Regions:
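A short, well-ordered alpha-helix in the C-terminal region of glycosyltransferases
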Residues: 113-129, 135, 154
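C-terminal alpha-helical cap of glycosyltransferases
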Residues: 129-163
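Nucleotide-activated donor-binding/catalytic signature segment of Leloir-type glycosyltransferases, i.e.
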Residues: 7-9, 20-45, 52
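Conserved donor-nucleotide binding/catalytic region of nucleotide-linked donor-dependent transferases
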Residues: 107-122, 142-150
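Short hydrophobic beta-strand element within catalytic cores of glycosyltransferases
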Residues: 72, 76-79, 89
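Short glycine/serine-rich donor-binding loops of glycosyltransferases
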Residues: 64-67, 85
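Acidic donor-binding loop of glycosyltransferase active sites
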Residues: 48-62, 75
Length: 163
């Protein structure tokens, strides 16, 4: 099964040389298309119509918002296990975590059979704004409880010494 590759990206000035030497030669292939930079309104349609998002990050990406955006559209993610990828992608549920180009090619065939509703459900279970807000509030409450616990104990001791 031949699968096309559509590249959507902004090419910053610092990346032009890399783009010209590494990416442009690939654009001669009939299955490779460079879309360029896309806006927020185009992104939802682009990701929603994609078979998968290929996220070949090779550095410790702290989060990778585009993975979440793809999952919100029900689009599985194929990504290397760097940075936040293992925390964001539920391997076999919302995508595949791979460690090579060959594994990514195999994963592209596998994710074609993934239930996009389950990908979306994984997003809703873990990454909606409401879910993340609830998790943040719980974390803040835990931190506040830990921070104030020694203070309360110290205050009780001082009060007991005065009386």
């Amino acid at each position: 099964m031949d699968v096309g590759l559509k590249l959507a990206a902004k090419v910053d000035a610092v990346d032009i040389a890399y783009f010209e030497t590494e990416i442009e030669p690939l654009l001669d292939h009939p299955l490779v298309e460079f879309i360029g930079e896309i806006g927020e309104t185009q992104k939802s349609e682009f990701l929603g119509n994609a078979r998968a998002l290929l996220f070949p990050i090779d550095w410790p990406e702290p989060f990778g918002l585009v993975m979440i955006e793809a999952m919100s559209a029900g689009t599985p993610v194929i990504a290397w296990p760097n940075g936040s990828v293992p925390e964001v992608i539920a391997d076999g549920v919302s995508g595949r975590i791979v460690d090579s180009i060959d594994a990514a090619a195999g994963a592209a065939r596998q994710v074609a059979h993934m239930d996009r509703r389950k990908v979306r459900a994984e997003f809703e279970r873990r990454f909606t704004a409401e879910r993340m807000a609830v998790a943040h509030i719980a974390a803040y409450r835990l931190l506040l409880a830990r921070a104030s616990a020694p203070t309360r104990a110290l205050s009780r001791r001082r009060w007991a010494c005065r009386h």
